[in-house]
From Swiss-Prot:
SUPFAM superfamilies: CheY-like, Methylesterase CheB, C-terminal domain. This is Protein-glutamate methylesterase/protein-glutamine glutaminase 1. It catalyses: [protein]-L-glutamate 5-O-methyl ester + H2O = L-glutamyl-[protein] + methanol + H(+); L-glutaminyl-[protein] + H2O = L-glutamyl-[protein] + NH4(+). Its main location: cytoplasm. Phosphorylated by CheA. Phosphorylation of the N-terminal regulatory domain activates the methylesterase activity. The modification 4-aspartylphosphate is found at residue 50. Residues 160-350 form the CheB-type methylesterase domain. Contains a C-terminal catalytic domain, and an N-terminal region which modulates catalytic activity. InterPro entries: CheB-like (IPR008248), CheB_C (IPR035909), CheY-like_superfamily (IPR011006), Sig_transdc_resp-reg_Me-estase (IPR000673), Sig_transdc_resp-reg_receiver (IPR001789).
């Protein structure tokens, strides 16, 4: 079901989705109140939802859906700072995917982004919201124990010695909520973390700011040449690749342009390959919930370089895609539930 107050958006989004034989559009309505009436007759598998609408805003509607009958929701948001902030509220309320729409040139943009829209809806249709709801209800806490070629060529791992531990995380669909749960559970004294979360540009800054306000550790959108420090997580900006580099015993990141890798920018494969080359055995790699196979090859390179490699298990994933492919190809040493990941991060620094 498509819920958007713009008749143009409803028409174009419906047309794009109907062009895929695997997708049936059961309705396109102008606001949440119309949607609720239609949904009493036929409940959709996925909802494509605008968040700025008359009569009832998308956030209120989303919270109502999640309370009554949890359903995968794809947010269709404008590329503005206000849109990004509101979208983060929607992600917090349970939305699993984000697609963007400009304020001008809307019709052409949506047609050009047809594949992105179709893939987002298909990923959402595979989402299993129950594990995430259980994890959010349990409010993860950890008590620390006291005792890719187009962007980065394959090469030898660094032989320089450093004892500084580093964590690299890659995730996609369902990852925003999963990352929030993991990072909130970490104490201030934690290893440095670098993260790729598939997300459009302009949204990662708002995502990092939200996490920073919720977590004991510092969370920032990565900037070029920014150092990776203990007690801090850096999130790759949307639309850019992030690579880990090392100068002596210190890690820093490069934020660069480049082609789509594994259909994404930022790409988990690019980050993981750079971690294999710069941190090798001092790294912990974690691949979490998401559709597709981005990060699989990079994680295999990390494991071959001596890093510890972990995957989120099927039972706790919203979409068991990326972790499944990583396990299948032998890139993963162990699979852990979402609730076990924070402790694994702390263990790597001891």
């Amino acid at each position: 079901m498509v819920v958007d107050d713009s008749a143009v958006v409803r028409q174009v989004v419906s047309s794009v989705l109907k062009s895929d034989s695997e997708i049936e559009v059961c309705g396109a309505v102008a606001d949440p109140l119309f949607a609720m009436t239609r949904m009493r007759m036929q409940w959709p598998d996925v909802i494509v939802l605008d968040i700025e609408m008359p009569r009832m805003d998308g956030i209120s509607f989303l919270k109502k859906i999640m309370a009554e009958r949890p359903t995968p929701v794809v947010i269709c948001s404008t590329l503005t700072e206000k849109g990004a902030d509101t979208t983060m509220q929607a992600i917090s309320a349970g939305a699993v995917e984000i697609i963007t729409k400009p304020k001008v040139g809307l019709k052409g943009f949506l047609h050009d982004s047809a594949k992105v829209l179709i893939n987002a809806v298909k990923a959402a249709s595979r989402a299993n919201l129950k594990p995430l709801q259980r994890a959010m209800a349990s409010n993860l806490k950890v008590t620390p124990k006291l005792s890719a070629d187009a962007v980065l060529a394959e090469g030898n791992t660094s032989r320089l010695k450093t004892t500084e531990q580093l964590v690299a995380i890659g995730t996609s669909t369902g990852g925003t909520q999963a990352l929030e749960l993991v990072l909130k559970a970490l104490p201030r004294v934690s290893p440095g973390i670098v993260i790729v979360q598939h997300m459009p540009e302009k949204f990662t800054a708002a995502f990092a700011e939200r996490l920073d306000s919720l977590c004991e550790i510092s969370v920032k959108e990565a900037k070029h040449k920014m150092r990776v420090l203990p007690g801090q997580a850096l999130i790759a900006p949307g639309g850019k690749h992030m690579l880990l580099k090392r100068s002596g015993a210190q890690y820093y990141v490069e934020v660069i342009d480049g082609p789509l890798v594994s259909r994404h920018r930022p790409s988990v494969d690019v980050l993981f390959r750079s971690v294999a080359q710069s941190a090798s055995g001092n790294a912990l790699g974690i691949i979490m919930t998401g559709m597709g196979d981005d990060g699989v090859k990079g994680m295999l390179e990390m494991r071959r370089a001596g890093a510890v490699t972990l995957a989120q298990d099927e039972a706790s994933c919203v979409v068991y895609g990326m972790p499944k492919e990583a396990v299948k190809c032998g890139a993963v040493e162990r699979s852990l539930s979402l609730s076990e990941i924070p402790q694994a991060i702390l263990d790597c620094s001891h």
